[in-house]
């Protein structure tokens, strides 16, 4: 077992530095990607207390709900629809300061106010996305993007190692 010990009085960047090293060691040696994604979503959710942290996995022409922490979520998202679908389509991170102002936003939860979605790649193809929602406006910034992309890199290495 592994306990996550992230002091609450640390800055966002210090929390990220801490969680990156802990997640890296947590997933070391685990070959099942669903288990890896499950614990990563739990660790991020536990550390930052955001509304929703989870993964959608590409299956055919849809993103299918994967491991997550938070309220009940949408099961399927089409390519190009909502923030997750647009992240898949454009293959780049999208930060949404106010989801009400994002054209085509899919409201899986009425509590969501801001969002960040990052693509996950396997062999140059989109494997899925990491989706994080907050109950506050303007939650996510470049610091979040920088460190969450490092965490996505850990996932991508696991996908390649376990091919």
Give residue ranges: language-model regions.
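Intrinsically disordered, low-complexity terminal regulatory regions
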Residues: 1-67, 158-163
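Regulatory loop-to-helix N-cap segments in sensory/regulatory domains
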Residues: 2-7, 133-151, 158-163
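Generic recognition of well-ordered alpha-helical segments
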Residues: 42, 150-153
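Short loop/turn motifs at secondary-structure junctions and domain boundaries
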Residues: 47, 107-112
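Regulatory sensory and allosteric helical modules in signal-transduction proteins
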Residues: 51, 58, 62-108
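A short, aliphatic-rich beta-strand micro-motif
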Residues: 114-121
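Short glycine-/small-residue motifs
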Residues: 128-129
